[in-house]
Amino acid sequence: MTRRLLWMVVCCLPFISGCKQSECAISENAIDDTIYQNLPFDMPKVQQPVFPAYEVNISKFGAKGDGMTLNTKAINDAIKEVNQRGGGKVIIPEGTWLTGPIELLSNVNLYTERNALVLFTGDFEAYPIIPTSFEGLDTRRCQSPISARDAENIAITGYGIFDGNGDCWRPVKKEKLTASQWNKLVKSGGVLDAQERIWYPTAGSLKGAMACKDFNVPEGINTDEEWNEIRAWLRPVLLSFVKSKKVLLEGVTFKNSPSWCLHPLSCEDITVNNIQVINPWYSQNGDALDLESCKNALIINSVFDAGDDAICIKSGKDENGRRRGEPCQNVIVK
């Protein structure tokens, strides 16, 4: 019996020695290297993030999954703690977690357990107006519910749902609804344009729309006060990752985004694996994924049910795009 047990342990060693106790790749859905075979272009394997074993639960930072408590500080404090400790996992357990913007930092895996719903607040004031890029142009928008900038080795994984509360933000065109749906929406509040064909959630949202000649980017808005007046029009993308490397989105669901859902910009080594994106059929600018000026990306095993484009591959627009000069390259969609 002792000899047989020893033989079993020795046989198992080759399988466990490839992953250090202190750090390990976290993908639960292994990527078959055959995906790189017979490509019409040369492409390196997309690098996957690896994280230390350290982990924290947001509940220990005071977060409450009751759907009423605003957990912005608790979630971001947990992320900062893991980042400062050298990396690991931030666990969002079962519950409904109301929050404002979440900023992901390097070496952090934001992991959602089953029956975890991360619901972003519909309070526009919770989202600061920041310089960004939208529709390929430099502009200002509200900070995204989920964001990262100049980060490396980051992930959002697990089984949970991220709900952008987009109905609070989006205008709705009459032609996209039935008569009863339209009447119900109008009675709920908000304002209509002069032709009564588009519903806006606030007067500020309508004012922002009127300031746009094209591409949803306002013109002639100069002071901070003027920008604040149209805050409701500055709908953020649900997830904005900028200039980040080794990015993984896996297993989770993103839904009901205020504008585009997922927008990696100038990122490298991106894996989108086994996720769902769900936006209503009437969602204005409700793209699922806009991959912009990115290099080395896998978009695999995922479902995109969007109110607009499912997948867009782009590299900026007009003078702004030419000045950036970053093509989108080495992308596999399967």
Predicted regions and their residues:
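Conserved residues at the C-terminal ends of beta-strands
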Residues: 93, 265, 314
